[in-house]
From Swiss-Prot:
Protein location: Golgi apparatus, Golgi stack membrane; Golgi apparatus
Gene name of this polypeptide: B4galt5
Protein name: Beta-1,4-galactosyltransferase 5
UniProt GO MF annotations: metal ion binding; N-acetyllactosamine synthase activity; UDP-galactose:glucosylceramide beta-1,4-galactosyltransferase activity
A GO term from the CC aspect: Golgi cisterna membrane
EC class of the enzyme, as a word: transferase
Species of origin: Mus musculus
GO BP, sorted A to Z: carbohydrate metabolic process; central nervous system myelination; central nervous system neuron axonogenesis; ganglioside biosynthetic process via lactosylceramide; neuron maturation; poly-N-acetyllactosamine biosynthetic process; positive regulation of embryonic development; protein glycosylation
Keyword terms of this UniProt record: Disulfide bond, Glycoprotein, Glycosyltransferase, Golgi apparatus, Lipid biosynthesis, Lipid metabolism, Manganese, Membrane, Metal-binding, Signal-anchor, Sphingolipid metabolism, Transferase, Transmembrane, Transmembrane helix
Length: 388
């Protein structure tokens, strides 16, 4: 009788345990879906730490190998006569470092191109992450008559090397935009770039489509001016160095390489998020961003694939120049896009079908003193993809 009761209790306990673990896993999956930003921050931190550990192991291995080689050559040289030349592992043919930024007394000429390494670019920026009203930002920059409607500015003392359109995807981040403008506008002025800000705001009930907003912003910006450089900039990323030059180059550029919330480590080699830059020619060649990524995640990885498929490589700033601070979020982020991995597996096949060439939209355009606001209601029907 007791044995029978024990047998009855065992399945019941197993069932309760199974229900408990099912409930726990369901709750975890739901949290990952509705709050992907928090979850992925921790995942990226762990991934970055793993990469750092791997690199440290490689460095230690190289140092051990060097010491072994040094010891071997030391023994060899001690047994040779004085006519032999010992190997000097400290010898280097590299030239001594030069000062790359111009001196304070540099003279500008109105008909000469602006240099890329100006004396006004000091390096570290004094970051102020406290919230500020947009009216206060307007008041702050209203003293500069050179800033035109829509945040358009160009230097008067030299010819700007790049005409830069700053594209900012936007939804419900009204407390972030003034903080970004407070830091970014003076930095771009110190870099002597011609620039304007485009805030592309998504309304409606569909999940956030960051990539499609960038495509819309590109199309609208090119109606204003023959821009030659595009900066795709998240609204919550604040650069920490004004030597992170927001011009473009022969290869696409990833600016935000070290983000504070990822412990200033690159989460993975193909990471292309936060702030990136391409020339207009490069952006058209890769067919822009994909339009099919609804919700959080995947579009930057697809952009990386597009860049590689087009024969480009990605350049990054050296050292700590690519450091950024992330403005804390006071609300829940966008939901996770669960279909991104299936799309990423077909990146190459989709590249010629999904992007600038299948984009349709209707925009409501208004002007702020410091940016052009482009409001769109995006739906999947506006960027349908044929079978591939």
């Amino acid at each position: 009788m007791r044995a029978r009761r024990g047998l009855l209790r065992l399945p019941r306990r197993s069932l309760l345990a199974a229900l408990f673990f099912f409930s726990l896993s369901s709750s975890l999956l739901y949290f990952v879906y509705v709050a992907p930003g928090i979850v992925n921050t921790y995942l990226f931190m762990v991934q970055a730490q793993g990469i750092l550990l791997r690199d440290n192991v490689r460095t230690i291995g190289a140092q051990v190998y060097e010491q072994v080689v040094r010891s071997a050559y030391a023994k060899r040289n001690s047994s040779l006569n004085d006519s032999d030349y010992p190997l000097d592992l400290n010898h280097s043919e590299a030239f001594p470092p030069t000062t790359t930024f111009l001196p304070e007394d540099f003279t500008y000429f109105a008909n000469h191109p602006c240099p890329e390494r100006l004396p006004s670019m000091k390096g570290p920026i004094d970051i102020n992450m406290s919230e500020i009203a947009m009216d206060d930002i307007h008041e702050l920059f209203s003293r500069d008559p050179a800033i035109k409607l829509g945040g358009h500015w160009k230097p008067a003392d030299c010819v700007p090397r790049w005409k830069v359109a700053i594209l900012i995807p936007f939804r419900n981040r009204h407390e972030h935009l003034p903080v970004l403008l407070r830091h970014l506008l003076p930095m771009l002025q110190r870099q002597r770039l011609q620039f304007a800000f485009y805030v592309i705001e998504q309304v409606g009930t569909q999940p956030f489509n960051r990539a499609m907003l960038f495509n819309v912003g590109f199309q609208e910006a090119m109606k204003d001016l023959d821009w030659d450089c595009l900066i795709f900039h998240d609204v919550d990323h604040i650069p920490e160095s004004d030597r992170n030059y927001y011009g473009c180059g022969q290869m696409p550029r990833h600016f935000a390489t070290k983000l504070d919330k990822y412990m200033y480590l690159l989460p993975y080699t193909e990471f292309f998020g936060g702030v990136s830059g391409l020339t207009v020619e490069q952006f058209r060649k890769i067919n822009g961003f994909p339009n099919a990524f609804w919700g959080w995640g995947g579009e930057d990885d697809d952009l990386w694939n597009r860049v590689q498929n087009a024969g480009y490589s990605v350049s990054r700033p050296e050292g700590d120049t690519g450091k950024y601070k992330s403005i804390p979020h006071h609300h829940r982020g966008e939901v996770q896009f669960l279909g991104r991995y299936a799309l990423l597996r077909k990146s190459k096949e989709r590249q010629g079908l999904d992007g600038l060439n299948n984009l349709n939209y209707s925009a409501n355009v208004t002007y702020d003193a410091l940016y052009k606001n482009i409001t769109v209601n995006l739906t999947p029907e506006l960027a349908q993809v044929t079978e591939y």
